[in-house]
């Protein structure tokens, strides 16, 4: 069996200093995200979403970011899924973007709010037809008997709605409103650069602190 203790990589592609970054973390994120896209990284819009259930037990999964602006980070999902139920019980979450080819991470923490129905409708209408039908066919996170059961539901909803399926009432968007955003740049000898943006409320200026790696 491979010895996991021997797997290691020394990071040396870049550095990160307070004088190098934008004072606004959303603009800084946009800069890094564009660099990830320009570097042609595979699916740079993927992120890990961590939630916590009422008993304090965490869960995590990969989801896709679908919007970022001064209000926060937006993603869409089934409100009745495990993550949806956990966010209803505890409306706080953490996101992690990991761009290993650039030796970078971005960690975002904050409270969760639902997007407006208009935002959810607009994004849902932009999805491929198969994905829109799939939102009806899948009772996300629920146990099913077989793959064929899922495919039967897909056919049934396809016949029912044709090429104009409406947005399911149990499907829509969330916005994570950040309270903290950390930018991480890998450095040699595990002495990485970590810059943390925080603010006391949504109307305050962002403060930047350097964290020990």
Curated annotation (Swiss-Prot):
Cofactor(s) of this protein: FMN
Gene3D superfamilies: Electron Transport, Fmn-binding Protein, Chain A
One Pfam family in the UniProt entry: PNPOx_N
UniProt-annotated binding residues for substrate: 8-11, 66, 123, 127, 131, 190-192
Pathway(s) annotated for this protein in UniProt: Cofactor metabolism; pyridoxal 5'-phosphate salvage; pyridoxal 5'-phosphate from pyridoxamine 5'-phosphate: step 1/1; Cofactor metabolism; pyridoxal 5'-phosphate salvage; pyridoxal 5'-phosphate from pyridoxine 5'-phosphate: step 1/1
GO molecular function terms attached to this record: FMN binding; pyridoxamine phosphate oxidase activity
Record note on cofactor: Binds 1 FMN per subunit.
Reaction(s) this enzyme catalyzes, per UniProt: pyridoxamine 5'-phosphate + O2 + H2O = pyridoxal 5'-phosphate + H2O2 + NH4(+); pyridoxine 5'-phosphate + O2 = pyridoxal 5'-phosphate + H2O2
PANTHER family documented for this protein: PYRIDOXINE-5'-PHOSPHATE OXIDASE, PYRIDOXINE-5-PHOSPHATE OXIDASE
Subunit structure, as described in the record: Homodimer.
NCBIfam families: pdxH, PRK05679.1
Name of the protein this chain belongs to: Pyridoxine/pyridoxamine 5'-phosphate oxidase
Species this chain originates from: Paraburkholderia xenovorans (strain LB400)
